[in-house]
């Protein structure tokens, strides 16, 4: 009888402890895919970051069109069976097509993104557009955690709606400016790629480290990820000057060839050689996550504004509350 009672008490105690643990368990707000994450993100499928518990796929609500755009920015589910190599010419063609699509407004996310999906034709009856996976080989002209104040990264600035306007490097995109020529001086001949913070590998968080800057000046990179149309901006003019954004009182937008981006990034590779003609072999490429070891670096230093971090960040999103 005493043994039975002891067993019963043990079962009840386990149930109470289990219930308590479940009640205190953190709940993910960001929904990844029903399948493993793509390409180099695959090992991190079950390794969410702090932001994944704080901010969902659509970020901070502004309107329905912005929600759709934010969800597309955070799309980690695009099919990778077919990866299309692209060049600046491809981005120019995409830009021309979207500029001439009547359903796409200037400087604002479109209400429907359907026309973006197969917006240009490729040889052999194929098409290309938003949601397809592409790869681009070029040079990093600039890399930085965007929407992060350089002097007061955890308290100043507005963040970005796609990341619930959270403040700090851990909660924002890494904005990469890419060119086909490492000596390119005109930003209107560049494109943009973005590393999102959701499920971001720790090594990628240091992509904008000053320790890599010298290497990037001379070595090509290969960026693979989803093709995405950022309707919140305007591209450079045909004359190669910054465009004026009608949705922002005709203020000058930042310079880039097209509104089409590689966003989010699924894989980053670096060429071991500073001569691009030697980068044609698969053996010439190294996953970025292995660059630290390959360069013989014992440590990699974050950029100055990214040295401080916090688990309970501030947000400029109206009504945003940290989970209990």
Where do the model's predicted regions map?
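OB-fold and OB-like single-stranded nucleic-acid-recognition modules
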Residues: 26-324
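Hydrophobic alpha-helical segments
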Residues: 16-18, 277
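Positively charged n-region of N-terminal signal peptides that target proteins for export
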Residues: 1-5
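Boundary at the C-terminal end of the N-terminal hydrophobic targeting segment
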Residues: 19, 23-25
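Bacterial N-terminal signal peptides
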Residues: 7-16
């Amino acid at each position: 009888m005493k043994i039975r009672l002891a067993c019963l008490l043990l079962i009840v105690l386990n149930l109470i402890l289990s219930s308590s643990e479940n009640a205190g368990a953190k709940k993910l707000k960001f929904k990844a895919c029903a399948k493993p994450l793509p390409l180099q993100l695959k090992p991190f499928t079950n390794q969410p970051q702090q932001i994944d518990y704080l901010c969902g796929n659509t970020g901070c609500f502004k309107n329905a069109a912005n929600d759709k755009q934010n969800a597309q920015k955070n799309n980690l589910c695009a099919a990778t069976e077919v990866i299309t190599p692209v060049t600046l010419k491809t981005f120019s063609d995409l830009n021309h097509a979207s500029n001439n699509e009547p359903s796409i407004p200037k400087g604002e996310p479109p209400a429907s993104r359907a026309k973006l999906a197969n917006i240009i034709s490729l040889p052999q009856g194929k098409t290309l557009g938003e949601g397809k996976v592409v790869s681009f080989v070029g040079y990093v002209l600039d890399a930085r955690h965007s929407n992060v104040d350089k002097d007061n990264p955890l308290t100043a600035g507005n963040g970005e709606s796609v990341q619930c306007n959270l403040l700090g490097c851990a909660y924002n995109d890494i904005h990469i400016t890419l060119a086909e020529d490492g000596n390119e001086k005109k930003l209107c001949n560049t494109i943009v790629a973005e590393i999102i913070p959701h499920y971001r590998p720790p090594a990628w968080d240091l992509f904008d480290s000053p320790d890599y800057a010298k290497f990037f000046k001379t070595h090509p990179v290969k960026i693979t990820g989803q093709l995405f149309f950022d309707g919140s901006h305007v591209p450079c003019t045909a004359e190669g000057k910054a465009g004026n954004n009608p949705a922002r009182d005709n203020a000058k937008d930042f310079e880039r060839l097209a509104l089409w981006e590689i966003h989010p990034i699924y894989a980053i590779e670096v060429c071991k050689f500073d001569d691009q003609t030697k980068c044609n072999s698969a053996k010439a490429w190294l996953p970025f996550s292995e660059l630290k070891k390959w360069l013989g670096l014992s440590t990699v230093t974050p950029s100055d504004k990214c040295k401080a971090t916090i688990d309970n960040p501030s947000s400029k999103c109206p009504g945003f509350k940290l989970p209990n």
